[in-house]
Structures are given as structure tokens and as C-alpha cells.
Amino acid sequence: METMKDIKARFASAKEGEYNALFRHYENDERSGVQKLIQQYHKKLQALEDERVRTESMKKYEHEYEHLGYLCGIDEVGRGPLAGPVVACAVILPKDCDILWLNDSKKLTAKKREELYDVILERAVSVGIGMASPERIDEINILQATYEAMRQAVSRLSVQPQLLLNDAVTIPEIQLPQVPIIKGDAKSVSIAAASIVAKVTRDRMMEEYDKVLPEYGFASNKGYGSAAHIEALKKYGPSPIHRKTFITHFV
């Protein structure tokens, strides 16, 4: 008789399409551990099916405009922080994209974002990233700097899209049709993918800044105005990556 360890290993190494055969194989095994394992994987299968339904509901705009050709999702991260750049990302996903768990990056754990970042970069038709520095933000204001980063992201795509799906904004000075979608990062897989890549890109930058400017806690606060960050700002003064126009109340 197979041990529980062996059976767990079989389930763990099985592909999704093999689960039903394993369920049938072990359905008459009366050991409670085996039956609990079967229930566990039944729940896993149901969760995957539920996620496919949810993901499909986020392809409404992609299906509506797919006749136009390449669709590009655009989103930004970092409009609100006191320090660091604003980062924008443009992502063109393939029409048959089957990536699961895409969502507004704020609704995902850091671990899940990192996993999806790799999958998106591997499967996307093209990805472009743009950013505006703290100095540029101070020079032209955060809204204009965000638009500039978005235009930069689009310009860095290796393929020209026929339509832009934007999270809530219409980007000026860009010669492509645009569809602004309120809360688009939760309604469009393309925008969600852009949200995730932008978030991971910026978070990694802030973690690197933390290594040379550890007193501000950038690895944890990512430049946002946490109580500890504001306290450090008052104690040490602004760093080279602080946005001067954002910190006038604190220094």
C-alpha cells in the first residue's frame, strides 16, 4: 500500500488535467488523510475554475476592441509618494492570453506580483517602461510627469499598438486612439498587467535606494509618507530622491 507521503507526492507533481484520474484512483481509499487530500485538490480545481471565470470577465474591453489589432494596457505607479520616481508601463498581451491572477497590483501580495511580473515579461508581445525622476516631477508637476512617463513607455514598445487602454486618464500629445477606463486595473487584463510590471519595477528601485539611504526606510514604505518616513525626513532632512514640491510641510 502506498504511503501518504507517496500519495501526496503524486498529487503535488500532477498536472491539472491529471487530477480527476487521481481522484478516481484513490476514491475508495478509506484513510482520512487520503480523503482530505482529495478534498484539498477538489478545492484547488474549483479555485482555478473560479479564477478563469474572473479573468475572463476582465477581458471585456480586450474582446470589444480585438478587431483593431494590438491593444496596449497602460498604468502608472508612484504618483503619491514623497520620494522616488513615477513609473509607467505599457503592455501588449497576446490575444489568446491565458495568464491567471491578473488584477490591480494593490490587491496582490508582493510575492504574487513578483511571480506575475516574470510571467508577463515572458508571454507579452511587448512591454515598455517609462519613468519621470523626482527632479522632473518638481519641474513640471506630478500629473505632467505621469503623462510624460506614459508616453515614454508607449514609445519603448517594440510593436506599435492600434489602441491604448488607460487606467482612468487620456494621455495628451499621443497620436493613438485611447480608451480611459475608471478603475481599469481591476477591469482589464492588459491594464492589470501594466499595473503589476510598473509596481514591481518601482518597488525594486526603492529597495535599491534603501541600500544607500537606509535611514528613510524606503524598502518598506516605497517612498510613501508613512509616520516613520516623515519622522526620518524631519530628523535627517530630504535625500536626493525626495520630491521637493511634496515635502514642504515636513522640512
Regions found by a protein language model. Name each.
Residues 1-72, 79-251:
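RNase H-like, Mg2+-dependent phosphodiesterase core
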